[in-house]
Amino acid sequence: MSPSLSRRSALQAAGATVLAAGFTQLSATAARADEAAVVTPKLVTYPRPSAMPTNTSFKVRVRTAPDGEWQTLDIWRPQLGEINPTTGSSKTYNSSLAYFDFQGSVEVEVTCLKGGTTKVRVRPDSYGIKPEVGGDTLRFTLDQPRNVVVQINDDIFDCLHLFARAVEKKKPAQDDPNVLYYGPGVHTTADGTLLVPSGKTVYLDGGAVLKATVIFRNVEHAGIAGRGVLAGTAGGGALVENSRNISIGAVTVLNPNGYAVQLGEATGVTIKGLGSFSSKGWGDGIDVFCSSNVVIDGVFMRNSDDCIAIYTHRWEYYGDTSNVTVRNSTLWADVAHPINVGTHGNSDNPEVLKNLTFKNLDILDHREPQMGYQGCIALNPGDSNLIKNVKVDGVRVEDFRWGQLIHMRVMYNTKYNTSVGRGIQDVYVKDLSYTGKPLATCLLLGYDAKHAIKDVTFENLVVNGTVIADSMKKPTWYLTTDTIPMHANEHVLNLKFLTTAEAVAAS
């Protein structure tokens, strides 16, 4: 270790860590002094079973601040995908993942073992983490749970994903009759599935790997908890069908052969703290079909298809989808959409997707060459679906590779649909911001006068620092949409762009 990394000064009054000479001013968030006085620092790390593949691009150490003992984290190997837009072939990349739990304040040290570090970025950018850098080693401090990506020299695949979670409040006893306990090590089942009865919790302890799809079918009051991993499953990670009051906690789904989580005709489902990585075709994150009262909170999704997809009828699922909230989460779509709503439905007995909320999200990337499948946020009703009462609040979008910021289209995609969607109504987008290269044109497209987009309001839409509003300064003959840029066709009715002050005055 270089001398500059072996010396440090005491915590400042605000709790920020300052490293010695050779580093620039540390601005990563640190514990406030008053909190440090009452919170006992704690750090929990977990082993990676030797049978699970690792990656050798990074070394990661962590310690309680200011002067705890350094602990080296085991590195896991998630795999990521990228589609060649000329051939349609998919390339798979090995990446890195480490995770731990903590309370109080911790210092994280990451060393890029490949060398040659010239640029470092810790994402999401909204966290404001500016690490101290010395050679190929960087340090930063955390005082609250964060899921971050450490990116070296703009490499978005051979990067480090770091899950810094809160310490579990209560771990079940291994012999609890209501717990299906899996301890550290690799576990399998006879047929690659695990059927969970009502009232039971599957507990994957840290360091546990379960190679089975966890299935909740016609059950209630059941769930998954712990800090373990669902890896290499023959199907998806978890399947919830015709069930109610199901919880899925802060486990990690690595490289499944399907969706990380699939909900069908489920109600009262909470997914909190889940991490997910995929590289294969149809590698969606969380797909919701014909379900209600769903909360997705604090998840990190990096997927090779839609990160979050919300639909009505498909396969044997029937009924409306309502009251779905996605919040406090980070989404990265290597293929398709971070958020996609409305494609699949029931042309014979039309259904509704309503009361959908997307709040406090960081969208780190979106890459989709196909125009019909673009949009960091996409509302695309087909199959006679009606989408209504959608709220987007506090979504930050970083520079993405390929696609559109917003895409709303009442569609009849004959590849997937048997009828045109009925429409989109009552969408309120507040505090959506984008920072990056100039945007490709966003599309808002009603299908015809009977299948229109109605009553869409943007409040405080910010594109590269410019607030987009109907009252903004622009040539009088320009449309507000020209400044984004966005195209809204003649079947988009009552489209508004407001400043925050204008929205408050109108309320």
Q: Model features per residue range: what roles?
A:
Residues P3, Q25-A36:
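C-terminal segment of N-terminal export signals and the immediately downstream linker at the start
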Residues S9-A30:
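N-terminal export signals
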Residues A37-P172:
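Beta-strand-enriched, solvent-exposed domains that form extended recognition/catalytic surfaces
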Residues A98-F100, L138-L142, H187-T201, V209-A225, ...:
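Extracellular beta-strand-rich solenoid/capping regions of secreted or surface-exposed proteins
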Residues A164-V186:
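Low-complexity, Pro/Ser/Thr- and charge-rich linker/hinge segments at domain boundaries
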Residues G199-T201, G206, E220-L230, R244-N255, ...:
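Right-handed parallel beta-helix
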Residues E368-S507:
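Extracellular beta-rich repeat passengers
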